[in-house]
Amino acid sequence: MRDQKALSVRTVVAIGIGTAILFILKRFAVIPTGIANTNIDISYGFLGFIATLFGPIAGFFIGFLGHALNDFTQYGTPWWTWVFTTGLVGMVIGLFWRRFNVEAGNFGMKKIVSFNLLQIITNVVSWSLIAPTLDIWIYSEPANKVYVQGIVSAISNSIATGVIGTILLVTYAATRTRSGSLKKES
């Protein structure tokens, strides 16, 4: 008998559907920033939302696969350092899914602030430091180019996640029945 718990059907379905939605958003719902290969990308708001609902494994694979599919279909080959970093962003945000517990129907101001602090720190570290450094090590890209791209991405992804992700989480939580809200009538 297996000691490890396999991925649930719910998580696998979330990965499949989430990857498809992320791919569509990355492909068709972006605004160019004027910096090469850098966009204002609302898919990061969706990734923050879906990672908060389904956890780190789903967050990683949705980010990784959705970004890889977009790069493959748009450019012919994935830019693996940024694909990995997108997966990492989804995973880190997903690590806190139990803390946010959106399924309980409560995503108030305290959780909104916590979510946004988490996603800003995650986006800044991931896009300003990790992705550009990997670009230099793996692809021998010029440092000034990739760090500018990374900083612009950190800012735009933080804003997109802060606005879109927060709206999605608050709206979703409002559709859930709050725990303890149902009372037996006398």
From Swiss-Prot:
Compartments where found: Cell membrane
Keywords from the UniProt entry: Cell membrane, Membrane, Transmembrane, Transmembrane helix
Entry keyword annotation includes Transmembrane helix: yes
Record flagged with keyword Transmembrane: yes
Entry-linked Pfam families: ECF-ribofla_trS
Transmembrane segments: 12-32, 45-65, 77-97, 112-132, 150-170
Signal peptide: none
InterPro entries, per the entry: ECF_substrate-spec-like, UPF0397
GO CC annotations, alphabetized: plasma membrane
Membrane topology according to the record: Multi-pass membrane protein
Similarity-based family: Belongs to the UPF0397 family.
Protein name, per record: UPF0397 protein LCABL_04350
